Amino acid sequence: MSAFVIDAFEFSRLKERREGAIPVTDLTRLADELADSSGTLHWTLTGGANHTDHAQLTLAVTGQLQITCQRCLTPFAFDIDSESVLILARDEAAADEIDALLDDDQIDVIVGTKTLDILQLVEDEALLAMPLSPKHAVCPDTSALEALKSGKKESPFAMLKNLK
């Protein structure tokens, strides 16, 4: 069994804890969404039980990603600092039942397995933490940058001379 594949219920029952770091390039679904796939995500997974004695996993993911601003189309750094609580259910029916009992949007219920891939959970968490439409707080002025690069600024009235 891979070091990143766990028996989710046993991991929770034993209150185990694992942590690590993974290069963003190893997370293909995430890398496809980024301006640059450099960087590393740090993660911590802790097993346990919630107040109703259901098996639970707590996943924390931190790191910095390079994403593209949807306004100016330039890359910028986005910090991820996300933590999720995942309650484990034996099957879909039990997951629906537990979800209805908890009535808490901050807690997700998933179907646990004996072969749960930690890295897939980390990648899912990072994807969910990204903004739907990423934007700078204040975009850099790219028009001034382009004018400097070209060296010559065209007059806004230049096209009027062709109207004669």
Q: What annotation goes with each model-predicted range?
A:
Residues M1-K15, A77-K164:
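Charge-rich, low-complexity linker and terminal segments
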Residues M1-Q66:
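A positional/architectural concept
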Residues E33-T40, Q64, R71-R90:
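Mature extracytoplasmic or otherwise solvent-exposed domains
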Residues A35, T68, K149-K152:
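Alpha-helical protein-protein interaction elements
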Residues L65-T68, K135:
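Secretory pathway export signals and precursors
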Residues C69-C72, C139:
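Short cysteine clusters
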